Amino acid sequence: MAKSKNHTTHNQSRKWHRNGIKKPRSQRYESLKGVDPKFLRNMRFAKKHNKKGLKKMQANNAKAMAARAEAIKALVKPKEVKPTIPKGVSRKLHRLAYIAHPKLGRRARARIARGLRLSRPQTKAKAKTEPQIKGKVKAQIKAQAQAQIKSKGKGKAQAETKPKAQAETKPKAQAQAKPKAQAQGKPKAQAQGKPKAQAQAKPKAQAQAKPKAQAQTKPKAQATPAAPVPAQAPPKGAQPPAKAP
């Protein structure tokens, strides 16, 4: 009896359109597009009939599973989960979520990174300048100590020279100050002495003038002869005074 053309085990794709036979698995599912269809078909028959080639089938099966997984990874694209900023959270968490957002926080992250970059060289520069600063401080301390020693020596020299200079300058200063003081004191003394002298001279002049005037008037009064007194007539019956012998 002749075999039916509809049940051939090889090259079934010729009669798909006529007999309604299913496509092999490799063509039936998109996930198995890259797998060899012959391998899948043979593996199916080996499960049922070929017990001798079980080890070979297992090895091939492992290869097929690995290829299938790779094909699935390549074909199936994972859906991108759009990040959302939660609402009704505290301000701090809201800010952190904004910075972590891939699109919205791009500028914020760039600004933070820039600030970090700018701050790093400053710390390095500080570390470099620390020994320089220490050297400068040491030099300043040495200079101050030397200046103090010099100032002490100058102070001693000045203390020794001061009495000499004062002894030399005192007579000069006195000699220069005397004519100046006399020149300044004369008009002041004259201006002050005039009213005092006048006030003192007035009572003295008056006191001297009074006795002089009295002394001049007294001798004048004495010098003038007294007027003659008329002689009184003797009373009647009275005897005249006797004449001296």
Swiss-Prot record:
InterPro entries: Ribosomal_eL29. Residues 157-171 have a biased composition (Basic and acidic residues). The modification N6-methyllysine is found at K5. Its main location: cytoplasm. The modification N6-acetyllysine is found at K33. GO terms for molecular function: structural constituent of ribosome. GO terms for cellular component: cytosolic large ribosomal subunit. GO terms for biological process: cytoplasmic translation. The keyword Phosphoprotein applies. Residues 1-33, 114-245 are annotated as: Disordered. The keyword Translocase does not apply. Component of the large ribosomal subunit. Belongs to the eukaryotic ribosomal protein eL29 family. Component of the large ribosomal subunit. The ribosome is a large ribonucleoprotein complex responsible for the synthesis of proteins in the cell. This is Large ribosomal subunit protein eL29.
